Amino acid sequence: MISKINFVKMHGLGNDCVIVNKRDLLNAHNLSQLAKNIADRHTGIGCDQFIIYENHNNFYEMIIYNIDGSSAKLCGNATRCLAKLIYLDTGKKDITIVVGNKELLCRIEDENKISVNVGAVSFNETWMPSRDKIWAFAARYMIDLKETICVDVGNPHLVIFSKLESQDQKIVGETLQAKELFANGVNVNFAEIKDNKINLSVWERGVGLTGACGSGACGSFAAGLKRGFIHSPSTVVFKHGSLNMKEENGNIIMQGSATLIAEGVYCCE
């Protein structure tokens, strides 16, 4: 029997997601497998993340899956996309989105400008290995990671303030998923700073190199502030656009666009 699922496809600076309302998942699905099937760019719809959301009156719950079927704790670009979708559906401009135990306060400035307060980040978590361990591990592959820092944005990030070619970014991104360093993997950010702007490339765990990463922008901005490399406000630049970043009372606030691509019905057996 074929099931039909209504979906919306959106992107934030080229980081695309397929969004489904939980009420449309009436039949029992293996959500991890469904995410993999939908994310496939040849046999599915194609996306970087698969998003399920549910309205709880005062807030919206968001569940995130990567293309490999693994779950994710945060996606900044998908958050902006979902906030815009809710705005288009309801007219609400102040929207609270909850992912796991993290509350994200969203504000629709206009249809092309959505702000997300991701709260405070942490530089001291049990999952974070020492810089010496990271350097020693990278040295096995003849890669010099000059300036690194771990940051938790609700999901784990490693920020590397060193210029690396794309082929080396791929090697480093894959290598640093080793269980001996990061038990559950890590998002690896390659940040270059010039004129108080961060040019950023991100290797997302469960995805690979992506066109943009909102949580990576937040983590890299916070890391740059901590190291004294930048000041607030700042801009994070990706291939397909940029995010405005600022810090207020210890909270990181991201502002950027979200774009509707398509609406349709996904058929699955």
From Swiss-Prot:
The lineage of its organism: Bacteria, Pseudomonadati, Pseudomonadota, Alphaproteobacteria, Rickettsiales. Pathway: Amino-acid biosynthesis; L-lysine biosynthesis via DAP pathway; DL-2,6-diaminopimelate from LL-2,6-diaminopimelate: step 1/1. One of its GO terms (biological process) is lysine biosynthetic process via diaminopimelate. It catalyses: (2S,6S)-2,6-diaminopimelate = meso-2,6-diaminopimelate. This is Diaminopimelate epimerase. The keyword Cell wall biogenesis/degradation does not apply. Pfam families: DAP_epimerase. Disulfide bonds: none annotated. The active site is at 75 (proton donor), 213 (proton acceptor).
